[in-house]
């Protein structure tokens, strides 16, 4: 109990984004369309990733950020809460969608990322 009382809380202020990942043989050229091999979604965002990493290492973590009132926002909150992150200070934005990161991953593991920050801003 004493150790828990003395434990410092790490506060992370940052982004929560849903990562939308498509695997492709290579990155497309401007104006080009490629066929990808498969598509995946992952909870992400620099802030959320840091919060989860710290929580997994045993720290008490509080996340401050903003997501939309949408499926991606619900998924992100559930994901970080699963790892023990306190989301009491993550706001839900009625008018703006949750941020997304569009990620292309090529056959060599190199990525390109375009972020639409949405509610993070």
Where are these regions (language model features)?
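Glycine-rich phosphate/adenosyl-contacting loop at the front of the ribokinase-like
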Residues: 2-66, 71-82
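Short C-terminal domain-edge/linker segments immediately following a structured domain
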Residues: 40-47, 94-96, 120-121
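Short, charged beta->alpha transition segments
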Residues: 50, 90, 99-101
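Glycine-rich nucleotide/cofactor/substrate-binding loop typically near the N-terminus or early
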Residues: 66, 100, 105
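A glycine-rich helix N-cap at a beta->alpha junction
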Residues: 79-95
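Conserved phosphate-binding/catalytic loop of the ribokinase/pfkB sugar-kinase fold
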Residues: 88, 92-93, 103-121
């Amino acid at each position: 109990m004493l150790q828990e009382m003395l434990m410092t809380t790490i506060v992370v202020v940052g982004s929560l984004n849903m990562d939308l990942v498509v695997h492709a043989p290579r990155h497309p050229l401007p104006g080009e369309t490629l066929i990808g091999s498969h598509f995946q979604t992952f909870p992400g965002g620099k802030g959320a990733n840091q919060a989860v990493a710290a929580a997994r290492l045993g720290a008490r973590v509080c996340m401050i950020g903003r997501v939309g009132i949408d499926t991606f926002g619900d998924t992100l909150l559930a994901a970080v809460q699963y790892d023990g992150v306190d989301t009491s200070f993550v706001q839900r934005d009625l008018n703006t969608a949750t941020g997304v990161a569009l990620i292309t991953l090529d056959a060599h593991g190199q990525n390109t990322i375009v972020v639409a920050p949405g509610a993070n801003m």
